[in-house]
């Protein structure tokens, strides 16, 4: 059973759940439907787990060529490949069924879109054949917070658009940093990521440009009236620091160590933004004016329902 758990990549699921919560609480604006949140979290976790299992199934040949992945479950033959594929499909069906039964069709379609991009477009073709695989794949990585948001709003509004842009832009330097400090692995497996095809210097330039765009997108949540000034300060400071780390790459003597630091801080950055949009959202006042709101209380919600 342990192997069937490991193949779902629990760490990736947990990281995505943080962003799902960010989008969900942002859209809830203090009026949290606990049952809906749990159903959304479990449903999208199953869909993500399905994608991870099927990605492992598809990548088992190239995983054997990379030091980082050569000990994965399917590479070592700890689970039959056919069983893994069936397991992956069942997880996906269960996740979509739960979302269909408890959320709305927009959430279901967004989940299917993210799954199709990751498994169909990225894993099956783009990862092995195109330098643009990271760019297209970023859409699937940006889907979870948008799904969380739309599970509440049932509307693909400006808030959903901004979330999609923020998390898509974040994916790029995050993924490029991995590609740099794992450059030998990607080269050995002939995966055409940007550092392999264009070199590390070109990748550094792309990283800086994407982080600049990310900074602008991140503050748009406040400028568009979705989050308060506390979010703005945290997003601004942490994003600028991340940009500073990226610029430091031009002077580094060790690209692998620098890229690993950039990667680790990218996780801190997106986690901080997800937390802050959860607790420093804005809600429309009765007269139509946007006002800052504090962290919603589940206890208060239960009293309200009762």
UniProtKB/Swiss-Prot annotation:
Entry-linked PROSITE patterns: UBIA
A Pfam entry, by short name: UbiA
InterPro entries tied to this protein: Protohaem_IX_farnesylTrfase, UbiA_prenyltransferase, UbiA_prenylTrfase_CS, UbiA_sf
One Gene Ontology biological process: heme O biosynthetic process
Pathway annotation from the record: Porphyrin-containing compound metabolism; heme O biosynthesis; heme O from protoheme: step 1/1
Similarity section: Belongs to the UbiA prenyltransferase family. Protoheme IX farnesyltransferase subfamily.
Note: Carbon 2 of the heme B porphyrin ring is defined according to the Fischer nomenclature.
Protein name (Swiss-Prot/TrEMBL): Protoheme IX farnesyltransferase
Source organism of this protein record: Methylobacillus flagellatus (strain ATCC 51484 / DSM 6875 / VKM B-1610 / KT)
């Amino acid at each position: 059973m342990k192997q069937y758990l490991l193949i779902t990549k629990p760490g990736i699921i947990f990281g995505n759940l943080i962003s799902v919560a960010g989008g969900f609480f942002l859209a809830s604006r203090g009026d949290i439907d606990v049952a809906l949140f749990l159903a959304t979290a479990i449903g999208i976790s199953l869909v993500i787990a399905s994608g991870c299992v099927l990605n492992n199934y598809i990548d088992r040949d190239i995983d054997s060529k990379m030091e980082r992945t050569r000990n994965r479950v399917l590479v070592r033959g700890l689970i039959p490949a056919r069983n893994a594929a069936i397991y992956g499909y069942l997880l996906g069906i269960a996740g979509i069924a739960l979302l269909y039964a408890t959320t709305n069709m927009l959430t279901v379609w967004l989940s299917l879109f993210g799954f199709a991009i990751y498994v169909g477009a990225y894993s099956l073709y783009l990862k092995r054949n195109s330098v643009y695989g990271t760019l297209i794949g970023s859409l699937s990585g940006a889907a979870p917070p948008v799904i969380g948001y739309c599970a509440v709003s049932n509307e693909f509004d400006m808030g959903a658009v901004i979330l999609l842009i923020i998390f898509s832009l974040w994916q790029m330097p995050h993924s490029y940093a991995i590609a740099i400090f794992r450059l030998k692995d990607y080269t050995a497996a002939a995966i055409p990521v940007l550092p392999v095809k264009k070199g590390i210097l070109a990748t550094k330039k792309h990283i800086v440009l994407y982080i600049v765009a990310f900074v602008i997108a991140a503050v748009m949540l406040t400028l568009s009236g979705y989050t308060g000034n506390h979010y703005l300060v945290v997003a601004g400071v942490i994003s600028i620091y991340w940009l500073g780390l990226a610029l430091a790459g031009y002077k580094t003597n060790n690209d692998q160590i620098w890229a690993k630091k950039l990667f680790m801080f990218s996780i801190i950055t997106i986690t901080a933004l997800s937390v802050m949009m959860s607790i420093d959202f804005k809600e429309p006042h009765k007269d139509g004016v946007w006002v800052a709101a504090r962290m919603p209380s589940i206890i208060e919600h239960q009293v309200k329902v009762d």
